[in-house]
Amino acid sequence: MFKSIVWIAPFIAGTIYALAPFLVRSAFRVAARCELEPIALDRLHKEISAEFNRRIAEFANLGFELVGTFDCGALTSDTRSYVAYFCNHATNEFANVTAMARPNGPASYIEFSSQFSNGRSIETNTNAILPLLPANPNHQVFRFESIDEPRTLLQVHRQVVEKYAPGLCPLGEPRDTEIQRYARIVEGCGPRLAAAEYMTLDDGGEAFRLTWKGAVRMAWLGLWPVTFVRRAIHRHAMQSELKSLQTRAEAALQKA
């Protein structure tokens, strides 16, 4: 019996790893356009509306003005995304609450971001989902899922900017056009991955679909035990980053 299990288990695992790219490639799509539609809070899913309302008050206390709440449409397969977008024009910092309506229930995270004249940007968020396709090398993303308070996350974001973009001044956006920055970031994802041959634009030009290269990478990185190992490594890296930031802050206080 034990010998049978030892033989069957690798066979099943191998079959799953062999079939997963086919399933992912046939199902996964990324929208080519980010069609942002303003939406009132009372038209949102009850849980998403409550989360946006709570965060709007918290961000206002931090000096961030609400740009608006938007329906982003189906940016990826089997999801519908919504965003509450904020801007602090005094510091040229941006913030957002992103929520996704999914078959297994809504999920959300908060984020602060800064962009610079050299084309780089730094994002600090609470998103626990790791990307399965290569990230933009010009966008440094720090994911601290253990942080829930916007004030704490903003403090960490500013420490991260000071560490990784010293001397660079954040760039703002003209008033009443701030949300276009969000649209540019989202719409830049597909073409960038297509240039790296992980995705390709479908015949209708409305969405990007995975190439075999992208499907294999996405499927295998999303399967256990790879996903477990990736999360453990990332969690350790972010804990180390927080300790490093704390050490830098303490050293700065001692010099003051």
Model-identified regions with their sequence ranges:
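Structured extramembrane domains adjacent to transmembrane segments
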Residues: 60-205
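Polar/charged alpha-helical tracts
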Residues: 37-46, 50, 54-57, 137-138, ...
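Feature marks short, highly hydrophobic, charge-poor N-terminal signal-anchor/signal peptide-like helices
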Residues: 1-10
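Hydrophobic core of alpha-helical transmembrane segments in multi-pass integral membrane proteins
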Residues: 9-17
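A eukaryote-biased signal for long
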Residues: 164-256
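N-terminal topogenic membrane-targeting module
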Residues: 19-82
